[in-house]
């Protein structure tokens, strides 16, 4: 059988060749956490989109990506400070894939040579958290406000909200603000001063 019979025109052959090369280059994939190692700060993550492949006979198949293991996680940290989160199984994330092998850098830090020549490989993923699909968003009990900076637990509704109006604390038991706390402290200090005056 001639190649032209299998693939059609030369243009189609080149398009298939380009596509086959692209299958080996990975940029980013949404994933779901399967496990989390808090000591190493790595996760095992399952990609949530299947790869579309075309066999030589023209049959289209969708293939599940393998489990990604030892994926470093990205927490916001700088200058000795870090914002961390309690990652758990089922959390979603976006895994991006490095231009080069990150193994030596991950183990030793500083500037390193790659252990092997590979680009955008599934072995060189880094997980970024915060991405969610619409289905999961629709199931959340509480959503962050669009008018403030918030630290929010979407399951309980507990939150710290910072806006132009001030800082507000919301919990399942009560809601208060910084101004209210200061007022209570001042009132408490006034009571202590009054008692000291009476006793003294």
Report residues per predicted region.
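Intrinsic-disorder/coil detector with helix-boundary
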Residues: 2-7, 157-200
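Hydrophobic packing positions characteristic
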Residues: 2-167
